[in-house]
Amino acid sequence: MALAANKLAEVEGGQVVVKDGQVIGLVELAIGGLMSTERAETVAEKTNTILKGFRTCGCNLNNPNMQLSRLALVVNPELRLSDKCLVDVTHFTFLPVIEGPAK
């Protein structure tokens, strides 16, 4: 997790897949973590490294990087996860991630 977070900080946003201490997929999205300054063809090639990385890690979901992107985009309806907390977008409130003592 630390390697992934540090890599994203280094490239100023994007998507990364890490396995066994190695970055195996990376696409830099330096504009708000959503858009790239690179040509579409280059971004498509890098996005393929993300998809291959997910498959290498055992994820067989259809287009998992887009599913994860939707989760974090806090302007979408319902609940969203931000870098700060869980957001109830419908009621414009922040929700605790952990409620009460762990059992």
Describe the residue ranges of each PLM region.
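Active-site microenvironment of metallo-dependent hydrolases
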Residues: 1-103
